[in-house]
């Protein structure tokens, strides 16, 4: 059975796609060039949208990226209004999403434990 999404979830996904395209193609600020939008959460009244992003640089230069995004937020919101038809255009709030880095770190730790365990069992003559 297909997963059902609420209207606000569909709108949030459309906002994420449109913002990603706008940032990639229209925003000329080099500070925001290498980011990926990971999620958008919109309040039920559509007044606010939390826009989560990651950067190829990790947390390096995060302040500059946030400054660039905040400076572009008016332009992004205006252009978003031309592309997405909703009764209230949300105010954009940008947040760094560190979950990708945490997930990568967890994966590295698990891989290391598996390698250590394999090496221990290889050296153990009883196994």
UniProtKB/Swiss-Prot annotation:
Superkingdom of origin: Bacteria
One Gene Ontology molecular-function label: ribosomal small subunit binding
InterPro entries reported in the protein's UniProt record: KH_dom-like_a/b (IPR015946), RbfA (IPR000238), RbfA_dom_sf (IPR023799)
Compartments, as annotated in UniProt: Cytoplasm
Any Pfam family: RBFA
GO annotation, cellular component aspect: cytosol
Keywords on record: Cytoplasm, Ribosome biogenesis
GO biological process per UniProt: maturation of SSU-rRNA
UniProt subunit comment: Monomer. Binds 30S ribosomal subunits, but not 50S ribosomal subunits or 70S ribosomes.
Protein role: One of several proteins that assist in the late maturation steps of the functional core of the 30S ribosomal subunit. Associates with free 30S ribosomal subunits (but not with 30S subunits that are part of 70S ribosomes or polysomes). Required for efficient processing of 16S rRNA. May interact with the 5'-terminal helix region of 16S rRNA.
Family: Belongs to the RbfA family.
Protein name: Ribosome-binding factor A
Phylogenetic placement of the source organism: Bacteria, Pseudomonadati, Pseudomonadota, Betaproteobacteria, Rhodocyclales
The encoding gene: rbfA
